[in-house]
Amino acid sequence: MDIEHNSRKKFYRFPFGAVTCGGEVRLRLAVSGAGIPSAVRLVYMEDGKGEVRKDMPYIFDVGDHCIYSVNVKMPEKAGLVWYYFELETERGMVYYGNNSKQLGGIGEMCFNSPSNSYQITVYNEDYKTPDWFKTGIAYQIFVDRFCNGNENGEFLGNRTDIIKRNWGEQPFYKAEQFGGEYKANDFFGGNLKGVIKKLPYLKDLGISVIYLNPIFKAYSNHKYDTGDYETIDPMFGDEETFKELCSKAKEMGIRIILDGVFNHTGSNSRYFNKYGEYDSVGAYQSKESPYYTWFRFMDWPDVYESWWGMTTLPQIEEHSEECRKYLLSDKDAIVKRWIKNGASGWRLDVVDELPGFFVKELRENVKKADKDAVIIGEVWEDASNKSAYGERREYFLGKELDSVMNYPMRRALIDAVSGRIDVEEFDARLMSIKENYPAPAYYSLLNIITSHDVERIMTRMGDAPSR
């Protein structure tokens, strides 16, 4: 017996890909050879619910194949629908599901209930993403390493606790050179004036979006240890310089996206204030601190949840109403404030470590500040079916993200160019993303070949086999 269903061909599944709530999907199965089944059924289920079986009547022949077909109405509530096929034959039950790589397209026959089902993403009809982002070319800037805009090349900020690098020096840092601890306190002196200075160059490159790594006040060079969400790091400039950057960039058709680090702050911050360097009363200093509920202490003050065990990055308690008001919903909340100051969107750091309710509230408030602002998430896998911390993520159902960083494309591209996969698998990987992502999200993907979190592409391809 030969069985075929190809989720990428409209003959077998129509319409292709993700669909809106309440829409209808036609599914077909082709069967040929000995042992024509006495019954063919579609088995489908909404995410987290039980299986539903629906008979698939024979409708016509195509060559030697008998075609079975059924129409299924998708749920009114956004979510994922999974399906496979079961056939009753004279030799027993036969099943047909997604392939073992779970990439969609042509599936596989088996004699036990398949572990891999096909996916249909069902999203809200009002899901819209900014048009300006869909056709843009983005350029990522790690501010300290980009350009020093001061004519004399001096460092801003007057800090005395840093290691100053020469601009042409190799950014190589051995922890043992500095007491055995990596403090991320070596700086090259890049600043926002430097970004402004390079805007004509970026425009000539065809850039229409600049994604800035974190720029708020923090101890480290990378600034993922936020010290103060309200203040541009003095080594980079100030609020007026940021406004000038956004204004001049817009004049050149370039928009600025900020890195939003809302899963954790720095231990050296106005909110935690472990070292007493801020004039606030931090959560580490007193249980009466206005920020005490922002963090998760197991044994105050020294034992607390932190990002991946890094005690310099105490984890935020997103259930704290006061924290969410400050970051998200107050009139001058952080996500609104910087949009009003000229930013055109946010890239959310480690978004899979933010609970869904937090991301939904963030989207609601960002879109209030600017309905055309973009919200991009850091997700490393297929973002349509991602599960994290026991929660199925709902990034693309219409209430959370506009899109994500396209790490799956990067991996597929590197594997293909390196000769690790053939062109058929390369195509299958990319088509799987197109099949699973709603069109508004798919056409807003931040397609990358490198980022600050992975090896630079020139380094990565150094081990590519010669062709």
Where in the sequence are the language-model features?
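Substrate-binding/active-site clefts of carbohydrate-active enzymes
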Residues: 142-208, 215-341, 362, 368, ...
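Short conserved micro-motifs at the rims of enzyme active sites and ligand-binding pockets
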Residues: 150-153, 387-388, 416-418, 458-461
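Active-site-proximal substrate-binding groove within the catalytic cores of carbohydrate-active enzymes
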Residues: 431-467
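Hydrophobic faces of well-ordered beta-strands that scaffold small-molecule active sites
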Residues: 137-139, 210-212, 256-258, 346, ...
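Glycan-association/targeting regions that enable binding to alpha-glucans and other polysaccharides
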Residues: 1-135, 139, 369
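Short alpha-helical segments and helix-capping/turn motifs at coil-helix boundaries
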Residues: 24-27, 69, 121-127, 195-198, ...
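Active-site-proximal helices and loops of the catalytic beta/alpha 8
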Residues: 246-255, 264, 269-280, 334, ...
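Short, flexible loop/turn elements at secondary-structure junctions
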Residues: 31-33, 46, 60, 74-76, ...
